[in-house]
């Protein structure tokens, strides 16, 4: 499955949306075509119910659905893939046990990017590019660091961390496949309108 270029929406329920499903709907209606369901707390039943709802929405819009961390939820909800962080399940083990699903890996250095690709990741989330309210303790990679990561691997790289509307042209100029956004869209007064603006900014950059 070809990964969509451009804006990569990550769900959250702590901003100007009702819940994770509503966040996914905002992204999709705004033109985003890859969605990550990212819930850190909650029961398996709750996560699975939300994931299945998001799966239905993604099907309606022809979008790719990724689940953060939880391989079990990804498989049970029929998601297209799973994103595993540096502290999560090893990429190669997930790849071996669940062939056929998209696997994303996190990277904050060139070495981590190369390791992720070697382990079998289908794409990378590289960052934090800028200081981020979602991940305040993360190492800052910066635009030049992002460029080095992009040049060090042959798989798609999505920039993540502190991405703003104004930073989209500079991120695209590094050769990144796309940019992951959470608060930049969901914390806006009008998240749907902001999603549309992010998508347009990428397309026109």
From Swiss-Prot:
Cysteines paired by S-S bonds: none
Gene Ontology CC terms: cytoplasm
MF annotations from Gene Ontology: magnesium ion binding; thiamine-phosphate diphosphorylase activity
One Gene Ontology term from the biological process aspect of the record: thiamine biosynthetic process
Pfam families documented for this protein: TMP-TENI
Cofactor note as given: Binds 1 Mg(2+) ion per subunit.
The protein's Enzyme Commission number: 2.5.1.3
Pathway(s) served: Cofactor biosynthesis; thiamine diphosphate biosynthesis; thiamine phosphate from 4-amino-2-methyl-5-diphosphomethylpyrimidine and 4-methyl-5-(2-phosphoethyl)-thiazole: step 1/1
Binding site for 2-[(2R,5Z)-2-carboxy-4-methylthiazol-5(2H)-ylidene]ethyl phosphate: 132-134, 162, 182-183
Positions with a binding annotation for 4-amino-2-methyl-5-(diphosphooxymethyl)pyrimidine: 36-40, 68, 106, 135
Residues the record lists as binding Mg(2+): 69, 88
Stated role: Condenses 4-methyl-5-(beta-hydroxyethyl)thiazole monophosphate (THZ-P) and 2-methyl-4-amino-5-hydroxymethyl pyrimidine pyrophosphate (HMP-PP) to form thiamine monophosphate (TMP).
Similarity field: Belongs to the thiamine-phosphate synthase family.
Name this polypeptide is given: Thiamine-phosphate synthase
């Amino acid at each position: 499955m070809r990964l969509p270029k451009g804006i990569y929406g990550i769900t959250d329920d702590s901003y100007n949306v009702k819940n994770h499903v509503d966040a996914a709907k905002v992204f999709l209606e705004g033109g985003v075509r890859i969605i990550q369901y990212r819930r850190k707390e909650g029961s398996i039943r709750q996560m699975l119910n939300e994931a299945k709802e998001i799966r239905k929405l993604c099907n309606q819009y022809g979008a790719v659905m990724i689940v953060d961390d939880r391989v079990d939820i990804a498989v049970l909800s029929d998601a297209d893939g799973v994103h595993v962080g540096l502290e999560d399940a090893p990429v190669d083990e997930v790849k071996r046990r669940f062939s056929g699903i998209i696997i994303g890996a996190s990277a904050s250095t060139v070495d981590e990017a190369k390791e992720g690709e070697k382990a079998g990741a289908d794409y990378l989330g590289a960052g934090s590019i800028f200081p981020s309210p979602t991940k305040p303790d993360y190492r800052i990679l910066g635009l030049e660091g992002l460029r080095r990561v992009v040049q060090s691997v042959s798989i798609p790289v999505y920039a993540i961390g502190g991405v703003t509307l104004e930073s989209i042209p500079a991120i695209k100029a590094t050769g990144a496949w796309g940019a992951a956004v959470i608060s930049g869209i969901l914390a806006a007064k009008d998240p749907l309108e902001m999603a549309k603006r992010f998508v347009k900014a990428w397309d026109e950059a």
